[in-house]
């Protein structure tokens, strides 16, 4: 989707072209790759992989230039064939959501801790054998999914994360899940005592849940990966439009307190979120 600005940043277009070239894809234009959201000429959301929103294509590798997508907020690259990720990916310091489940990953970049804005990191259903020590630097992390890998060891630094190790959210999603691994001895204390240490999600149910999350991000009404005054205006317009009922997506994104009504309370919640950030 576009925000009305028909200009595309050449750096971002170059990255998309690099992805097409390195994977030998038969795609004529970079803006036809997967699903994309652009804001002020920059790519803010990118979905690509063997799923509907991803264009039903399979990537095998990523170019080093992926780290140049400096405004990217949301990246869904599940259902691909990645074995490793380029170190340059850790330059994506504005990235909030990173979903790389259902790949073949055996490791993560050592400097993943540089991705300081990450809230959601999903590495489920890969072949990960270890986690980098720097994982503990991700102080904004709320969700960490590492289930169904080949992990036998986790660094103690993981306990630096501000995660509710035992909890589930309002959609019954666990904040943490590490089931389906080989985690037995000498575990970090936060993991050893976690009620979610054996938590995993069945692939069929998992796919449904993530699709819902993919399409509905609370307070982000224009789905650009940023919560700002544009979203406040969108809520006001919904409230003022007395002739039409809000769509399911509008309710999902704008009803911040989940009381099934969109009103001034939701506007205040968005304003407070912007101020806090």
Map each language-model feature to its residues.
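Glycine-rich active-site/cofactor-binding loop and its immediate structural neighborhood
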Residues: 59-64, 68, 76, 80
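N-terminal capping/linker segments that flank leucine-rich repeat
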Residues: 1-61, 172-175, 179-219, 223-224
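Cellulosome-associated attachment modules in secreted, modular CAZymes
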Residues: 213-277
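Consensus "Asn ladder" position of solenoid repeat domains
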Residues: 57, 80, 100-103, 126, ...
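Leucine-rich repeat
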Residues: 40-41, 68-71, 90-95, 113-118, ...
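The feature encodes a structural signal of leucine-rich repeats
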Residues: 62-67, 85-88, 108-111, 131-134, ...
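Tandem-repeat architecture and repeat-register "anchor" residues
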Residues: 65, 88, 111, 134, ...
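Conserved hydrophobic beta-strand positions in leucine-rich repeat
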Residues: 44-49, 75-77, 95-100, 119-123, ...
């Amino acid at each position: 989707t576009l925000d009305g600005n028909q200009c595309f940043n050449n750096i971002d277009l170059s990255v998309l072209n690099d992805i097409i070239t390195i994977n030998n894809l038969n795609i004529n234009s970079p803006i036809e790759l997967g699903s994309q959201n652009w804001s002020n000429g920059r790519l803010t959301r990118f979905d690509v992989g063997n799923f509907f929103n991803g264009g039903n294509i399979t990537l095998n590798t990523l170019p080093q230039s992926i780290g140049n997508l400096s405004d990217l907020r949301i990246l869904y690259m599940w259902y691909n064939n990645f074995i490793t990720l380029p170190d340059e990916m850790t330059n994506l310091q504005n990235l909030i959501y990173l979903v790389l489940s259902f790949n073949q990953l055996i490791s993560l970049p050592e400097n993943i801790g540089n991705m300081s804005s990450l809230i959601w990191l999903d590495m489920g259903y890969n072949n990960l054998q270890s986690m980098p020590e720097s994982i503990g630097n991700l102080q904004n992390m709320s969700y960490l999914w590492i289930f169904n890998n080949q992990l036998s060891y986790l660094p103690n630094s993981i306990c630096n994360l501000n995660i509710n190790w035992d909890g589930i959210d309002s959609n019954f999603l666990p904040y943490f899940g590490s089931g389906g691994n080989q985690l037995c001895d000498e575990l970090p204390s936060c993991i050893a005592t976690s009620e979610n240490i054996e938590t995993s999600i069945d692939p069929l149910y998992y796919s449904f849940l993530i699709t819902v999350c993919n399409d509905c991000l609370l307070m982000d009404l224009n789905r650009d990966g940023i919560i700002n005054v544009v979203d406040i205006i969108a809520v006001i317009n919904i409230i003022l439009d007395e002739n039409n009922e809000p769509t399911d997506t509008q309710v999902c994104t704008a009803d911040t307190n989940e009381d099934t009504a969109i009103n001034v309370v939701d506007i205040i919640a968005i304003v407070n979120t912007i101020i806090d950030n």
